[in-house]
Amino acid sequence: MKKYLFIPFVAVFLASCHESLEERAEREAKEFTKKNCPMKVSEYVTNDSMTYEKDSHTIHYYYSIKGKADTTALDKKQAKAELIKGIKDATGIRNYKENGFNFAYTYYSTKNKGQILLDVKITPKEYNTK
């Protein structure tokens, strides 16, 4: 009898510890930002933060650009193609890709505070093509 009372308790306990993929994405984004940001990616680019936008199922990366790269003359088509390739090649986000998450990248100017130089959203349709 005690055995049968224990089984539902364990099931409820384990279920309460289970974290959905969306909850995990939100938690990991907050942890990444807190532990790593701002993080210098290159001489001209800094990763400022990462968020998870539950309503659009999107992992969103925010960057600042400085120096000679801080210009509106970015080749947006080429930049998007490189970001798509990066997503395709990234193994650390495989679980998110397999579950159809979107990925967004926003690059801000450092010299013109608040100015968006590049704002790209990449969907599963784009990163799942060959």
Regions found by a protein language model. Give the residues of each.
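A short amphipathic beta-strand at an alpha->beta junction
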Residues: 87-116
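Short edge beta-strands and adjacent turn/loop segments
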Residues: 41-66
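C-terminal motif of bacterial Sec signal peptides marking the signal peptidase cleavage site
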Residues: 13-16
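Short, non-transmembrane amphipathic alpha-helical segments
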Residues: 71-96
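Signal peptide cleavage region of secreted peptide precursors
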Residues: 18-27
